[in-house]
């Protein structure tokens, strides 16, 4: 405990004006209702007097508050009050859902006008991520009509270039082959076919590319359109995803 500074005297004055000198390092004023004020004379530092309010008892909700109000240029009035701290409700907040992780590679096997018409990687990522419901590693390959036709013939037996092809590796029904591992697959977009379709259907080119990426990503995750019920469910999913991306219903 610091010693009282040299030359400092503590004098108590009673109601009759009688003074008594007190030898002390700290004064405690007890108000009798649990409030207590402690005055300490520091032996160093900036302050001439340290004042601390306290509340007796075990109620952690009681908070002592000191209010000071100037009463003159050389005087202040001090008040000690006890306020009840607000109780913090114990609420179980919902945990934010973890977004699926998309590992994306974009390959461009294009030249000339096809290359200029191809979407950018950041666009493809945005469209693919919107349709993603599980972690996935996806390669999107943008090709010309010759490669698109060869792939469609080799894998589907159809001798023409189609707008989008989906290839899933080692998975069945849109689920990873090994639990905990990401879904893996390729999307192949034939750029000149997509450009031609957009013009014929009166659609913005980016809207048509977005639709086909979403369509391919849903195929990758197990959705199909082999019958009317499947087709309706897939079209509804595509429409909702595209609406979230700011695009109109592609089937309207």
Swiss-Prot record:
Subcellular location per the Swiss-Prot or TrEMBL entry: Cytoplasm
Residues the record lists as binding Zn(2+): 215, 219, 225
Q: Which domain of life is it from?
A: Bacteria
One GO term (biological process): rRNA processing
Q: Which InterPro entries match?
A: MetalPrtase_cat_dom_sf_prd, YbeY
Protein keywords: Cytoplasm, Endonuclease, Hydrolase, Metal-binding, Nuclease, Ribosome biogenesis, rRNA processing, Zinc
Chain positions covered by the region annotation Unknown: 1-90
Its EC number(s) = 3.1.-.-
Region of interest called Endoribonuclease YbeY, as start-end residue ranges on this chain? 91-252
Which family is annotated?
Belongs to the endoribonuclease YbeY family.
Enumerate the NCBIfam families for this protein: PRK13963.1, rRNA maturation RNase YbeY
The protein's role, per its UniProt record? Single strand-specific metallo-endoribonuclease involved in late-stage 70S ribosome quality control and in maturation of the 3' terminus of the 16S rRNA.
Task: Write the protein's name.
Answer: Endoribonuclease YbeY
